[in-house]
From Swiss-Prot:
One of its GO terms (molecular function) is iron ion binding. GO terms for cellular component: blood microparticle; haptoglobin-hemoglobin complex; hemoglobin complex. This is Hemoglobin subunit alpha. O2 binds at residue 58. The gene is HBA.
Length: 141
C-alpha cells in the first residue's frame, strides 16, 4: 500500500519527468529488450532497433499510462481498467514482464535523475510500479 509520502514521491517524480516521459519509456523498453530478450516475442511486428519509431511510439504509450496512473494513484483499478483488459484478454502478456519493465524503468529514471533518485524515492517508485503491475494482472483468470 502506498503511503501519503509514497504518493507525494511518485507525483513529484512524474512532474520532474515532464516532457521526457516518452523518451524514458522508449529507453526502458530498449533496456528490457536487450536485458530480457524473451520479451521481444510480444512485439514480432515491431522494428526493435535502437530509436525505431515503433519503440518510441510504444514508449510514449507506457509513459502516458504511467502518468495517468500517477495522476490517479488513489484509484489505480479505475485508471488502468482498460489497459488491464487489453493485456489480460487480447495481448495475453505474461505477468512477469511487468516486473521486468518496471525494473528497467527504475534503472532509466535513476540514470537520468541520480540526485533525485534517493532511497525513499526509489522505494516509493518501486511500490508504485508494483501496484500498477498488480492492477494490470488483476484480470488474468
Amino acid at each position: 500500500v502506498l503511503s501519503p509520502a509514497d504518493k507525494n514521491n511518485v507525483k513529484a517524480c512524474w512532474e520532474k519527468i515532464g516532457g521526457h516521459g516518452a523518451a524514458y519509456g522508449a529507453e526502458a523498453l530498449e533496456r528490457m529488450f536487450l536485458s530480457f530478450p524473451t520479451t521481444k516475442t510480444y512485439f514480432p511486428h515491431f522494428d526493435l532497433s535502437h530509436g525505431s519509431a515503433q519503440v518510441q511510439g510504444h514508449g510514449k504509450k507506457v509513459a502516458d499510462a504511467l502518468a495517468n496512473a500517477a495522476a490517479h494513484v488513489d484509484d489505480l483499478p479505475s485508471a488502468l481498467s482498460a489497459l488491464s483488459d487489453l493485456h489480460a484478454h487480447k495481448l495475453r502478456v505474461d505477468p512477469v514482464n511487468f516486473k521486468l519493465l518496471s525494473h528497467c524503468l527504475l534503472v532509466t529514471l535513476a540514470a537520468h535523475h541520480p540526485a533525485e533518485f534517493t532511497p525513499a524515492v526509489h522505494a516509493s517508485l518501486d511500490k508504485f510500479l508494483a501496484s500498477v503491475s498488480t492492477v494490470l494482472t488483476s484480470k488474468y483468470r
